[in-house]
């Protein structure tokens, strides 16, 4: 059975994703993907995990843009979520995607070195 915080996290995820497509006009916010949302059990804090396609400078600019839009996003959450208290929002860059890319590149290196070793043995 779902906890209420998980349902709220899912609703926040959908709302922020929709706002990124339709509502936010900040030029610093580029190709952003919301990868997950965790809401505390007391519903006072929503941690929003995101990834960005681009350089480190673009990642930092996007995080600044998202942080400057927190008030607007929270206001929109208050309009659409029927809750007594609208959670505060914290944006965090999701390093798991970068970590996954790093693992994938290591596996490709291992695979290519094994193939070259097999060719040399033949």
From Swiss-Prot:
Main location: cytoplasm
Any one GO molecular function term: ribosomal small subunit binding
Any one GO CC term of the record: cytosol
Keywords per UniProt: Cytoplasm, Ribosome biogenesis
Entry's localization field: Cytoplasm
GO biological process, one term: maturation of SSU-rRNA
Matches recorded under Gene3D superfamilies: 3.30.300.20
Highest taxon, organism lineage: Bacteria
PANTHER family in alphabetical order: RIBOSOME-BINDING FACTOR A, CHLOROPLASTIC-RELATED (PTHR33515:SF1)
Its biological purpose: One of several proteins that assist in the late maturation steps of the functional core of the 30S ribosomal subunit. Associates with free 30S ribosomal subunits (but not with 30S subunits that are part of 70S ribosomes or polysomes). Required for efficient processing of 16S rRNA. May interact with the 5'-terminal helix region of 16S rRNA.
Protein family per UniProt: Belongs to the RbfA family.
Subunit organization: Monomer. Binds 30S ribosomal subunits, but not 50S ribosomal subunits or 70S ribosomes.
Name of this chain's protein: Ribosome-binding factor A
Originating species: Geotalea uraniireducens (strain Rf4)
Lineage, top ranks: Bacteria, Pseudomonadati, Thermodesulfobacteriota, Desulfuromonadia, Geobacterales
């Amino acid at each position: 059975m779902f906890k209420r915080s998980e349902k709220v996290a899912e609703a926040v995820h959908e709302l922020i994703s929709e706002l990124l497509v339709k509502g936010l006009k900040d030029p610093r916010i580029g190709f952003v993907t919301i990868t997950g949302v965790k809401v505390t059990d007391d519903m006072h804090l929503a941690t929003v995990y995101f990834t960005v396609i681009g350089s480190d400078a673009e990642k930092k600019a996007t995080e600044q843009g998202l942080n400057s839009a927190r008030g607007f996003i929270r206001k929109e959450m208050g309009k659409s979520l029927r809750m007594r208290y609208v959670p505060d929002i914290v944006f965090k860059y999701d390093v798991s995607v970068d970590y996954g890319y790093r693992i994938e590149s290591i596996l490709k290196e291992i695979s290519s070195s094994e193939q070259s070793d097999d060719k040399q043995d033949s």
